[in-house]
Design a protein with these regions (language model features):
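Extreme N-terminal starter segment of soluble prokaryotic enzymes
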Residues: 3-9
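Short glycine-rich, Thr/Ser-proximal phosphate-binding strand/loop in the N-terminal lobe
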Residues: 16-61
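Short beta-strand-loop/turn "lid" adjacent to the catalytic site in phosphate-handling enzymes
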Residues: 72-121, 139-141, 147-156
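Glycine-rich phosphate-binding loop of actin/hexokinase-like ATP-binding domains
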Residues: 151-248
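Phosphate/ATP-binding catalytic cores across multiple sugar-kinase/actin-like superfamilies
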Residues: 184-187, 191, 294-315
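A mobile "lid/hinge" subdomain adjacent to the ATP/sugar-phosphate binding pocket shared
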Residues: 251-295
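Glycine-rich phosphate-binding loops at beta-strand->alpha-helix junctions
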Residues: 318-340
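Glycine-rich phosphate-binding/hydrolytic loop that grips phosphoryl groups
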Residues: 327, 341, 348-388
Length: 388
């Protein structure tokens, strides 16, 4: 056991993983993840930023409760559990909450209502919250992917459907990936040593979203009422003509739920090429697979088109920020950002292949490649709630 100071645990649930980070007296004591939850779960962690032998060890984590037990087992090597004073969770859907919230029974009940709108993440977060609330006598705090977008202008968050229905069911563009977009902005401005007024952030992982930011505030984003809206993603269709859904229900004899599952799990890049991972697509293109090439071109085209739309919405652009696994691939940086020179987005080929953090521009618009750090951002913005 390395220390007994007051500690904060950060929990970040994904669709098949749980990231965790333990802060001990404001320093990172351990950073880890249980991924591939199910039959082939693995536990990896870094102690004080030094990789340990336990990188990628197989663990018994068939579900999120068992994954949480594995996390507890790791934590006990670093801190007495009673010294963990705060637990901070990433929750994908927070409705209209615009700030982190102490988790009370009423807050938890409210968050559970949003599970159908974020089925890949919300139920997992609820399972983890209930588990750790039983295990740890600490302050439990929720941070929401939606809260960065909670004050978007009505022009951006309104759907053109009957107002009575929108109000009755709270149907609006909530936006997601907010913790990622906010952390990307924070990182780029820290590296640049300056603030940017007009910014577009691009979260490029298996889930894809862009955000238009003016003076540090989200003013538009691609995801909407659910994380299914927006750009094409690894397995998600992104925005499509809504009439396609009843059409498929009728002609394929499917229920709306079945069609929704198809759009969430069997669409996007996977539908176009057979692969959802950009690395597999790049390898396929190299082998001469025409479907992989088309999927990559399709993907880059739609991102470029959205960047152009947000430049118009912002009336200019000072900084473009890319983060997430796809942003680490120089070939994807080139593919996505080529052809935007008329917008002032010009690549510096000399540093295009450099690892993040790096500014890869030689035009008037700064282009930053930085790492997303949701856990660090969550720790920072919950300071007031943690220290009450």
């Amino acid at each position: 056991m390395t220390g007994n100071g007051n500690s904060t645990l950060i929990i970040n649930a994904g669709s098949s993983s749980v990231k965790f980070r333990l802060y001990l007296n404001s320093a990172i004591a351990v950073d880890g993840v249980v991924d591939a939850i199910g039959k082939n779960a693995r536990l990896s962690f870094v102690k004080n930023k030094v990789y340990q032998e336990m990188q990628g060890v197989r663990v018994q984590a068939r579900n999120y409760t068992e994954a949480a037990n594995e996390i507890i087992n790791v934590l006990e090597n670093f801190v007495a559990l009673k010294k963990i004073k705060s637990v901070v969770y990433r929750v994908v859907h927070g409705g209209l909450y615009s700030e982190p919230q102490r988790i009370t029974p009423s807050v938890l009940k409210e968050l559970e209502k949003f599970a159908p709108l974020a089925p890949l993440h919300q139920p997992q977060s609820m399972t983890l919250i209930r588990f750790f609330m039983q295990q740890l006598k600490a302050r439990h705090i929720a941070c929401f992917d939606t809260m960065f977008h909670a004050k978007m202008p009505a022009l951006a968050n309104t759907y053109a459907i009957p107002r009575a229905l929108a109000q009755k069911y709270k149907i609006m563009r909530y936006g997601f990936h907010g913790l990622s977009h906010a952390s990307l902005l924070r990182a780029a401005e820290q590296y640049a040593g300056k603030k940017y007024q007009k910014v577009i952030t691009c979260q490029l992982g298996n889930g894809i979203s862009l955000c238009a930011i003016r003076n540090g505030k989200s003013v538009d984003t691609t995801m909407g009422f659910t994380p299914l809206e927006g750009l094409p993603m690894g397995t998600r269709s992104g925005s499509i003509d809504p009439a396609i859904i009843p059409f498929l229900c009728k002609h394929e004899k499917k229920t709306p739920r079945q069609v929704l599952s198809l759009l969430e799990h069997e669409s996007g890049l996977k539908a176009l090429s057979g692969f959802s991972d950009i690395r597999d697509l790049l390898a396929g293109e190299k082998r001469g697979d025409a479907r992989c090439k088309f999927a990559l071109d399709f993907f880059a085209y739609h991102i470029r088109k959205q960047i152009g739309a947000y430049v118009a919405a912002l009336n200019g652009l000072d900084c473009l920020i890319l983060g997430g696994g796809i942003s680490r691939a120089p070939k994807m940086r080139q593919r996505i950002l080529s052809g935007l020179e008329t917008l002032g987005i010009v690549l510096n080929q000399k540093v295009l292949s450099h690892e993040s953090p790096v500014c890869i521009s030689k035009g008037k618009v700064a282009i930053w490649i930085v790492e997303t750090d949701e856990q660090g951002y969550m720790y920072e913005i919950t300071k007031g709630l943690r220290e009450v």
